[in-house]
Swiss-Prot record:
Function: Cell wall formation.
Subcellular localization, as worded in the UniProt entry: Cytoplasm
Domain FAD-binding PCMH-type: residue ranges: 33-197
Similarity annotation: Belongs to the MurB family.
Record-annotated active site: 176, 226 (proton donor), 296
NCBIfam families: murB, PRK13905.1
Descriptive protein name: UDP-N-acetylenolpyruvoylglucosamine reductase 2
Disulphides: none
Organismal lineage: Bacteria, Bacillati, Bacillota, Bacilli, Bacillales
GO MF: FAD binding; UDP-N-acetylmuramate dehydrogenase activity
Length: 305
């Protein structure tokens, strides 16, 4: 279908300024790479998301969903069809020890809201840069905590635009993975069950984790966080470091000198630079240690022609 027609129709469904053509997706990822989206939409509520899905299904238009772009590499050729950004779906409510957070809310912000209400259980998330939806998608975690420990249920939208509530068991959580990598559900909101705590103790733990993160991670450059999952009984960063790869650069992207598990965009790097460096690191580590590093970061989109 003609993308101009798609743009014109969706412009009648969403608020002014929330539908764009040929939007550069590097403006919507933490690592500042990514080509153009044919049509880019940023819904403000669930009804608008449903309208987009039903329209796309009617005309067989591919749809790609983005959170805040913290753990994704979008290829330099961009994304065909409709790209849906969920960054405006950000509501958070607190009732007793329960927090309900919508998909586009930053998980860091949710952890801070928990602190404000003297609730403990989300301290580990105080330095995770992703959205709530992204955190559920990959079962994000840090410093001994992970999303699956505090999630009780979530509201999702099916590929047909229907709303469903799923309990935690349906998520099939594992280490940095969930069922959402294999189905077409869109995570809309999450319900977290926390415990009452002491403000000063919660804040002290968050301050400690923030200090550790800032002292060990290369926050001065754009990055997608940990590139690889932790291999069994080992650490990706340790294997990369011992392979002599810190400082290895392809194009504008290099293996961080501060933390070998990170790849940073130091000089206008491209998605292809990232992909080539990832493959080089995987090949080198496997040749040296016999360990296959599995990507944690998602790669989506089309190659540049």
């Amino acid at each position: 279908m003609n993308m101009q027609e798609v743009y014109e129709y969706l412009s009648t469904v969403l608020p002014e300024g929330h539908v764009k053509q040929d939007e550069m997706l590097k403006n919507h990822t933490h690592i500042k790479v990514g080509g153009k989206a044919d049509v880019f939409v940023a819904p403000t509520n669930y009804d608008e998301i449903q309208e987009v899905i039903k329209y796309a299904n009617k005309y067989n238009i591919p749809v790609t969903f983005l959170g805040n772009g913290s753990n994704v590499i979008i290829k330099d050729g961009g994304i065909r069809g409709i790209t849906v950004s969920l960054i405006h779906i950000t509501g958070v409510t607190v009732t007793g020890t329960t927090i309900v957070a919508q998909c586009g809310a930053a998980i860091i912000d949710v952890s801070r809201i928990a602190l404000e209400h003297n609730l403990t259980g989300l301290e580990f998330a105080c330095g995770i840069p992703g959205s709530v939806g992204g955190a559920l998608y990959m079962n994000a975690g840090a410093y001994g905590g992970e999303i699956s420990y505090v999630l009780t249920e979530a509201v999702v939208m099916t590929g047909d635009g229907e709303l469903r509530t799923l309990t935690k068991e349906a998520f099939e959580f594992g280490y940095r993975k969930s069922v959402f990598a294999n189905n077409h559900y869109i995570i809309l909101e999450a319900r977290f069950e926390l415990e009452e705590g002491v403000y000063e103790e919660i804040k002290a733990k968050m301050d400690d984790l923030t200090f550790k993160r800032e002292s060990k991670q290369p926050l001065e450059y754009p990055s997608c966080g940990s590139v690889f999952k932790r291999p069994p009984n080992n650490f990706a960063g340790k294997l990369i470091q011992e392979s002599g790869l810190q400082g290895k650069r392809i194009g504008g992207v290099e293996v961080s000198l501060k933390h070998a598990g990170f790849m940073v965009n130091v000089d206008n790097g491209t998605a292809q630079d990232y992909i080539d460096l990832i493959h080089f690191v995987q090949k080198t580590v496997e040749e040296k240690f016999g360990v296959k590093l599995e990507r944690e970061v998602r790669i989506i989109g089309e190659d540049k022609e």
